């Protein structure tokens, strides 16, 4: 019998885990897709943001950017291809637990962005670096892959999800876990379930600790109130993916599929400012970046051609 968060940790990051065996985001030959894989414009918007923050921080040199959960390096590549004002000051650190993806990422970024340079402003690490710095920590769809503990409300108190031979096994939760669940969702009805996202909270604290001055920028799917989880079936907020399709039970064939959980933003430390990704991209000038293409398409409507 294995506690659910420990089971997911092994299924994703263990020796034979989903990410350890080379699974990744992407359009072809991958199991899921994230914003950097849909368009280079996402990286261009990140670059615009980095340029602005660099100016707000009075142009520090070095200006350190840490990307956690960097995967195959797609976002890092697009940032280097787009960044302007802070290009000479930027020192980029990709943090990725998967050995295969770290190798792919370093090769992708160096060959696409620094082919003719003997030294590159780039490092690839397995974990967040020690010490503090001035810059930005960013993470795109990282927190949803940090395994949660899962609780269920019953007449006798809170139970905690374990996995036993590919099936659910609910056990009485430790006192401290019951206390946390009751505080987070005091109105939960019997039979409803709730994630405790302790690993996400720890990661946020670690990321903030690395910043002497700067910003923490996180993109993820989630909800502003944990109460929302108790109003939805567990299968709606705890999901699996394989070959770009929903992939059924997370307890079967561990290591063969991605396991993801919506993020409860109210369980994260601090007072995060929350907005939709669409709103954030608009603030970084996405519409102005696509204005030429939009006008080209509209002008070609009467007689469409390849340029449109």
PLM regions: where:
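Conserved RecA-like P-loop NTPase ATPase core
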Residues: 42, 137, 220
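Long, Lys/Arg- and hydrophobic-enriched amphipathic alpha-helices
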Residues: 181-308
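A mobile, often basic/glycine-rich helix-loop segment
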Residues: 136-185, 231-240
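Generic detector of well-ordered alpha-helical packing
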Residues: 68, 97, 142-145, 221
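Short catalytic/ligand-binding loop motif for oxyanion handling, primarily in non-cytosolic enzymes
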Residues: 75-76, 145-147, 225-228
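A residue-level signal for conserved active-site and pocket-lining positions in enzyme catalytic cores
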Residues: 11, 137, 268
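A short SAM/SAH-binding and catalytic strip from SAM-dependent methyltransferases
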Residues: 128, 132-155, 193-198, 202, ...
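Rossmann-like AdoMet
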Residues: 1-68, 72-128, 132-133, 279, ...
